């Protein structure tokens, strides 16, 4: 089976001015993926007897263009081969023994260059580099069991990058943490990354549901760089996260961007660790129009201390205080084949000191408002 998939997103911000100027941040992401799927396992071949459960082999080619207005464009392209197994109606295994991506930084601006000249970690994360990776993902989904009133979905994934190439270099006498290792004249990333997510859909009554979600992730880089590739790091905020706050506007940790420290003043904030919790009550309004109220919480953190981002490292004693919190309400129009969603987020707590006492520390109510138009449910 041959398939083509297009995806895109556009972000515009009416607040969060960068440096007091009147210009806004307008960013977009575009992606194209082509797939070729065979309804059996290839390489290696098994016995002629067919498996007693669905299995497939998929080859992919993909390209993703990320545009951060006023700063840079990042093109990530590559391919992979993966095996899919579904031994039961509720369990799904995905094994990707080969995935190779190349990150190409394009069209940097003078403003961006001035930032990276003094921020080497940021420059390292956005350098041209290969990401040779392998991945395993397990997914459990009991929604096919229609006799169950409530449904559970959870997924765990682990990715390792650079292990095979590092082994080859080790045979050539290179040290494990040596930083000049290359592939085709460009550095390659070395990291291990894990994510876990669980969702529970509890039916309250006629078309009324209470849906909960927990998500956690970690990435640790080593070898060629102590900073992970930019597009592999975690971020928080936006239409599918903490909806009271703009995407990539929270964290890491208690770090606060101010006029005296503008090395990260381009608003993109990323981290090595992530925790997020969401609770949403969904209910019918009229016909295909549905409503929702929600509560979102979470943050990102750094594993290693970064003097340019004080307060960004995870400290267990302040974990709860580090969690940003927002609430809000939304409308969903269900067309069966697609769901059109509009959410309004309301900020309740920021993890850094805003100068306002008490748990509700949003300086101005309007500053804690987020508006999101999206396709599909957030989780």
Predicted regions and their residues:
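C-terminal outer-membrane beta-barrel translocator/porin domains of Gram-negative envelope proteins
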Residues: 1, 12, 92-283, 293-316
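Strand-loop-strand
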Residues: 10-12, 18-23, 39, 307-335, ...
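Flexible, small/polar- and glycine-enriched "cap/hinge" segments at structural transition points
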Residues: 298, 303, 328, 332, ...
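Gram-negative/organellar outer-membrane beta-barrel architecture
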Residues: 1-155, 243-244, 255, 339, ...
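Short coil turns and loop connectors of transmembrane beta-barrels in diderm outer membranes
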Residues: 42, 87-89, 204-208, 285-287, ...
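Glycine-centered small-residue hotspots that permit tight backbone geometry or close packing
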Residues: 78, 131, 238, 324-330
């Amino acid at each position: 089976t041959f398939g083509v998939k297009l995806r895109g997103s556009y972000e515009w911000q009416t607040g969060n001015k960068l440096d007091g100027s009147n210009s806004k941040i307008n960013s977009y992401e575009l992606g194209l993926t082509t797939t070729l799927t065979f309804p059996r396992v290839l390489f290696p071949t098994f016995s002629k007897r067919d498996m007693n459960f669905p299995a497939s082999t998929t080859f992919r080619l993909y390209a993703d263009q990320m545009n951060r207005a006023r700063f840079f464009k990042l093109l990530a392209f590559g391919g992979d081969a993966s095996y899919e197994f579904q031994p039961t109606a509720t369990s799904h295994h995905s094994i990707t023994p080969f995935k190779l991506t190349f990150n190409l930084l394009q069209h940097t601006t003078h403003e961006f260059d001035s930032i990276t000249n003094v921020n080497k970690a940021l420059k390292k994360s956005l350098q041209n580099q290969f990401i040779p990776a392998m991945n395993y993902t397990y997914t459990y989904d009991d929604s096919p069991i229609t006799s169950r009133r409530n449904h559970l979905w959870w997924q765990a994934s682990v990715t390792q990058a650079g292990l095979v190439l590092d082994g080859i270099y080790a045979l050539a006498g290179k040290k494990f943490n040596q930083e000049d290792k290359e592939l085709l004249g460009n550095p390659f990333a070395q990291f291990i990354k894990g994510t876990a997510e669980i969702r529970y859909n509890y039916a309250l009554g006629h078309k009324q549901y209470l849906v909960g979600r927990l998500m956690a992730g970690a990435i640790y880089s080593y070898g060629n760089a102590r900073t992970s590739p930019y597009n592999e790091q975690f971020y928080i905020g936006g239409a599918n996260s903490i909806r009271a706050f703009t995407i990539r506007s929270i964290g890491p940790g208690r770090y606060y961007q101010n006029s005296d420290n503008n090395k990260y003043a381009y608003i993109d904030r990323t981290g090595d660790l992530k925790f997020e919790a969401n609770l949403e009550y969904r209910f019918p309004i009229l016909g295909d129009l549905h409503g929702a109220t929600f509560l979102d919480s979470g943050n990102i953190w750094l594993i290693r201390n970064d003097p340019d981002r004080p307060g960004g490292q995870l400290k267990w004693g302040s974990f709860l205080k580090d969690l940003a919190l927002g609430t809000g309400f939304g409308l969903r129009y269900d067309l069966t084949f697609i769901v059109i969603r509009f959410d309004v987020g309301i900020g309740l707590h920021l993890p850094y000191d805003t100068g306002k006492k008490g748990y509700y520390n949003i300086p101005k109510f309007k500053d804690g408002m987020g508006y999101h138009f999206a396709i599909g449910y957030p989780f």
